[in-house]
A protein has these predicted regions:
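Alpha-helical scaffold elements lining the catalytic groove of polysaccharide deacetylases
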Residues: 8-15
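Structural preference for beta-strand elements that scaffold enzyme active sites
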Residues: 29-33, 58-62, 123-126, 160-161
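Conserved, mostly hydrophobic/aromatic
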Residues: 16, 23, 34, 61, ...
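Active-site-proximal helices and loops of the catalytic beta/alpha 8
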Residues: 35-119, 152, 169-199, 203, ...
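Active-site groove signature of glycoside hydrolases
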Residues: 15-42, 126, 130
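Carbohydrate-interacting/catalytic domains
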Residues: 143-147, 157, 162, 166-278
Length: 278
């Protein structure tokens, strides 16, 4: 683990930097995930960032962070991005408690347009599970919420990350140990959740607004959330219904018609919009 090394020692730093150069030269890697980045010396991070910027223009440093002000580890002299554990908790908790106000508050606090918002314009690594936490299919009390929670993951600001196996609903409880979360997989088990996530990824990749757009809450209810993403003249409304019943949403869409990014169908906002049950 890098944090256990003497990062003030020039010989240690040069060795680590030579390793990075070698990986780029031999394997053409595109970036590094830095374990426990919140424990690393900030001076070392600054030097590593300088190396990254010099050896490959789009080389990305992604740091593991848990709490605190992520700007400490995510800036022009440190990581390009960090793990968004604040919204990770808000994602599953909002669905389990039927309280979309929790995640909408976190998203606006992080990415909104007000001057006090923390990470507007930055791109944190978003996730609903990973190798260190209980799988989302296990932690959700209502498995029907798997589809809408991934819809929210790909609709919110950030870089969406899908943990292997979770794209088909693999379960695993952290309380049973790390091997439960990191099993060997012989072959994919594709299903409707896999297809749904693939469709979300396709829509996200093709949308400037979803990739780097602003964030604005439009409608927040206990089990429903609608927000706007905007970039370069493109507006996307992300609508989440975490209920087994349809919901008639009445709000100012700012237009009369739109195109569904998932289905390609036209959508008429006249008379309100019905959000289908999950």
């Amino acid at each position: 683990c890098i944090r256990d090394r003497n990062l003030q020692n020039p010989a240690v730093k040069n060795y680590l930097f030579d390793v990075v150069r070698g990986w780029v030269r031999d394997y053409d890697i595109d970036g590094l995930r830095l374990d426990v980045a919140y424990c690393l010396d900030l001076g070392f991070l600054a030097e590593l960032r300088g190396l990254a910027d010099s050896i490959k223009p789009e080389f990305a440093l992604v740091g593991e962070t848990l709490h605190g002000d992520y700007n400490r580890w995510m800036n022009d002299h440190a990581c390009h991005s960090v793990t968004n554990y604040e919204c990770y908790k808000g994602l599953y908790s909002s669905f389990n408690t039927g309280n979309m106000h929790e995640i909408s508050y976190s998203l606006n606090r992080q990415f909104g347009s007000e001057q006090w918002c923390l990470y507007t314009g930055k791109h944190l690594l978003s996730f609903v599970d990973n190798h260190d936490v209980t799988r989302i299919a296990t932690i959700l009390t209502d498995k029907g919420c798997l589809h809408p929670i991934y819809g929210l993951l790909f609709g919110m600001p950030g870089v969406p990350s899908v943990y292997y196996g979770s794209e088909w609903g693999m379960e695993g409880d952290k309380r049973n140990g790390d091997p439960t979360l990191r099993p060997a997989v012989e072959k994919p088990e594709e299903n409707d959740l896999t297809a749904w996530i693939a469709a979300l990824a396709h829509a996200h990749t093709g949308s400037k607004a979803l990739c780097r757009g602003s964030y604005r809450n439009v409608l927040v209810q206990p089990k429903q959330l609608i927000f706007e993403r905007y970039a370069d003249g493109e507006r996307v409304l992300v609508a989440i219904n975490a209920d087994a019943n349809p919901f008639d949403a009445h709000f100012d869409a700012g237009c009369g018609r739109a195109v569904d990014l998932i289905t390609g169908d036209d959508h008429d906002f006249g008379g309100g919009s019905t959000l289908e049950p999950y």
